[in-house]
Amino acid sequence: MTLGPPPLTGDSAAGVIARMLKARGVDRVFGLCGGHIMPLWMRLDAEGIALVDVRDERAAVYMAHAYGQLKRAIGVALVTAGPGVTNAMTGIANAHVARAPVLVLSGVPPRPQENRGALQDMVHTDLVRGITRYARTVREAALVPQELDQALARAAGLGGDPGPAYLDFPTDTLRGEVPRALQAPFWFEPQVASRCGAPLAVD
């Protein structure tokens, strides 16, 4: 008899996120670990993406901002629910003012517990919408590829200036399976960010 949730696979929403980020050239993620993001943390590690664990979520976003600028790419930060997001907001606001391409990922309680006083249950998107280019809660595993693609594109400057984009996911969504039919190959192809600056094009 085994206790706890089943092992996470590469077809889980968390696995698809990690695979897409790796395919898009993300080689490290800055964050502070927490229960709501453990599925994603585990799959990022499984994909060989370096996890830089910090002591404060502001630092995670600052570091993602700086790393992205140095690489002329999108920096990625991963923070947990509630105080993880509120702590990160200073870094998100700084990236917004600087028009820096940063993707911030977080988690929320499982869908059956939303708006019922669960641990660290907050509507994060309402908090960050004014300082991001894109802010969504992705509740269905099947929507993960297109929402992550859209967030990366908006952060890179699609339709306007670059800037931070924000996505969060219920923990049960992160553990849910993305149907193979929806894992189209183009989601996992490298894509040059539109306004980040292509390293080969910069003298």
Regions found by a protein language model. Give the residues of each.
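N-terminal alpha/beta PP-like core and its mobile active-site loop of ThDP/TPP-dependent enzymes
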Residues: T2-D203
